Amino acid sequence: MVNGYLYTGPLPLGSVVAHNCGAAGLFSDKVHPEVILEAHEVEGLYTLTVTIGDSVQIFEGPVSSMGRRQIGQALLRYLREYQGLPAEAPWGTMVGVRPTKLLHKYIDTYGSVHAATRHIRDEFSVSMEKLATLGAIGEYQRPFLSDTDDKKVSLYCGIPFCDTRCVYCSFPYGLYQDYAGKSQFLRALTRDIEDMKAIIQSYNLTVDTLYMGGGTPTVLKDEDFHQVLKQLSLLVPEGHEFTVEAGRPDSVNPTKLRSMLALGVNRISINPQTMQDDILRRIGRGHSVRDIDELLQYVKNNTSLAVNMDFIAGLPNQTMPNMIENMDYVCQNLPENVTIHTLALKRGSPLYDLHMEDDIPEEHLVAEMVQYDKERLEAAGYVPYYLYRQQYMRGQLENIGYTLPGKACEYNIQIMEERQSILSMGPGSSSKWMRAPEYRQLKQHMPKDVDVYYETIDALLEKRHRICERFWEVV
């Protein structure tokens, strides 16, 4: 197996090369690359030379978006074969593209889900099984995406802290207990939320959904959590979708749950990732299976909150019996939503830095787990309702959200399909302003560094106001 690559050549082709090398499990490595890729552009023709040891392969194509795609597709097949993997992955050569976002674009163009999936099959060689899942999700999502009123928005509030770091996580979140600037962060976040309230009122916006994510929002102290939640509750109309990512069961208690219920939260995410204590310890979760079950049972017996549960296929040393146990638990308890993630080996994560990749199950085993989950969940009455893919995912697979009928999380659909403006608060969050029919974006990214966030909050809010004025007052 080869792991590192070095590319030199035209930048437009380099972006395509990077996506396809990532899909084949390779990382950029300028020091000790095992794969050397050299590209040249001469008289309207790209030539890409790939050298792996004594093996040399040359790919050519016209200097155009189609030519770059063709070279990328051929490169991906070659690298997968070199790695001893099937040349054609389930998603074919679809790399660097959100499948459902492309599907909806093609539905707009060609008029039906059937026509759209046919074009995707022809263009990317996607398997019939994945096309069927993609089409079903597109059909389910379409009613959520039909409203083109650009005064309807969703909101996101990010709390960029956890109390431990999972081995697969590459996000630059800090440990809350170690952070010295808590009061400055909370003051800046308060200003951010108050400013968002003013924007909503100034432009007469309707908030469809609000998602409080992270990190782990429930890592905040009870009183701080209540105050932030109270401010957020003023932004979302009563009865509209209001989610709190309570991902770590050890960070949630009855006091926080009472705050959620009193302030209009109607959905939470409880994320076990797996239901085996030995794997939980190995991946750094910091909680037990018992913690998960006690929280879920408390929520079911004492609240009306809808529940999402996240699981990951491909964790270190995970086996099919482990996944069967996970799905047994889901089917016994029937949370409203279940999200099945495929492990992505990300540079910057402890999993990558500690060279634990040898502990990750083989690609075909992860694919079997994902397929098993699909069959068990659909047999239990769940339907797939959103999907996305990431670079470096095991088996070049996908993450899929499943829902019981009528219980889908609309925010998940809107954030993935990018057909509604999503305005965000907090460090590391991103706002995107969208308008039909082009759905082109205006964007603002808040700094990931919490110190920079609170030190520059005035300038950040001024910039957000300028973008809002440009978007809603100049049409």
Regions found by a protein language model. Name each.
Residues 1-101, 105-112, 401, 405-475:
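Radical SAM enzyme core and accessory elements
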Residues 48-50, 157, 268-270:
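Short beta-strand motif preference
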Residues 82-88, 108-155, 203-204:
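N-terminal [4Fe-4S]-dependent radical SAM core
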Residues 150-186:
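Canonical Radical SAM [4Fe-4S] cluster-binding loop centered on the CxxxCxxC motif
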Residues 152-154, 209, 241, 337, ...:
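Beta-sheet entry/capping signal
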Residues 173-372:
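Conserved non-cysteine loop/helix-boundary elements of the Radical SAM core domain that shape
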Residues 217, 392, 428-431:
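Short, glycine-/Ser/Thr-/acidic-enriched flexible segments
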Residues 348-425:
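A C-terminal junction/extension of Radical SAM enzymes
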